[in-house]
Amino acid sequence: MTRDHKKNSNIADRSDSKKSEGFSRRDFMKRSGFALAGTLLASRAAIAVNTAPRKVRIGIVGGGFGCSFQWHEHPDCIVQAVSDLREDRRKRLMNVYKCSKAYNSLEELVLAKDIDAVAIFTDGPLHVQHTIEAMKNGKHVISAVPAAWATIEQAELLLDTVKKYGLTYMMAETSHYQQFTISARKFYKQGKFGALYYSEAEYQHAGLEGLYFFNGKRTWRYGVAPMHYPTHCTSQLVSVTGERLTEAVCHGWGDDSPILKDNAYANPFWNESAMFRTNRGNAFRVNIWWKGAHRGCERAQWIGDKMSFFAPHPNGLGPVIVRSGEQMEKDDAGFLRKAPKFEQYKQPHWWQTDMLPEPLRHNSGHEGSHTFLTHEFVDALVHNRRPVIDVYESLAYTVPGIVAHNSALKKGERLKVPQYERPA
């Protein structure tokens, strides 16, 4: 079902939506009268460059990560205003995006009549609250990860909000558009893997302690559970095959650090490792580690019966492809087998191609993903379509991690992952 075209026919003239107060799901549902009938944008599965004269007027909130995108370079976008609670970050945003208008807070920015969409790069636990604030004032939203914070209730509140207001929501998951993930997606669509029966993804990021304090006070990152930040890994499979993660078994490791003994999330783990089952019966292993004798990485590997693809590994391997072969050989124990073919893979720079408008055909953050995220959101609004990482895709990346952390707290109990299906 497609959204009413008239509602989206003129982005620049969008009016404010009716307001909804409060941020608990129960209060939200009660006060909204269960008004969840907002229609969805038409689906389109692939990026294609097709600029239009109409421009999206966007407001950027968050002068840290929010400074690393290319809104000002996109031919169909205007950076109308910026915002951050800190003056130094407001000035940084204004300088990066060559924007003369700044607001002291998101709450002020979303009231502006000359803004169509808001890019939310604020503290993780506030993403849902800020999405609600933006949408109740008639603004489309792209949000940093994760889409929802730590609870299923938050995830469902986000979904209810997007349904209620019928506006566009997208999560800015970088791994979806890392260059090797784009390659894996193309291999899968071409059928080169054969049966892709097993995958692995890992996000290893030591050194985050440097973000735990600001001006002597704890930030939201202090003591964050690894699986509450799962999307850099989960997207590596879900975005490639379209599978959904349906069951989780997870184990965690921690030590006697004061950070793990006293944090806002009651999280006892530095590292968490999960095994997921997919709706197709396949296995998917995910490691998210904040500490240990390992080299940092954000990568994956996809194992099929005809071909396997290994993204670059920090220990020096990859990217490589292994193909099943026909020539027979004996292994070191004398067993006869078909000899696999091992080959180096020369990773294309997909950001140099016509997948992007010409001004965005340059490298960018997180393995070239930021220009793709910029284009996908703007293009979805301009051409009245559903963004690839819409609210349903976002929850398919986010919710499995919430469940996995609960499994780790229960010493590896197998838990079901709630499913949120996109209407046909």
Predicted features by range, described:
Residues 1-23:
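N-terminal secretory signal peptides
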Residues 101-105:
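Conserved SAM-binding strand-loop segment of SAM-dependent methyltransferases
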Residues 117, 123, 128-176, 191:
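Beta-strand-loop-alpha-helix segment that lines the small-molecule cofactor/substrate pocket
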Residues 60, 143-144, 151, 169-171, ...:
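Hydrophobic residues in well-ordered beta-strands that form the structural core
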Residues 64-67, 168-170, 175-267, 272-273:
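Predominantly a Rossmann-like dinucleotide-binding segment in NAD(P)-dependent oxidoreductases
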Residues 3, 29-52, 117-120, 164, ...:
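C-terminal helix-rich "cap/oligomerization" subdomain common to oxidoreductases
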Residues 265, 277-278, 301, 306-389, ...:
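C-terminal glycine/acidic-rich active-site capping loop/insertion
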Residues 32-97:
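N-terminal Rossmann-like dinucleotide-binding module
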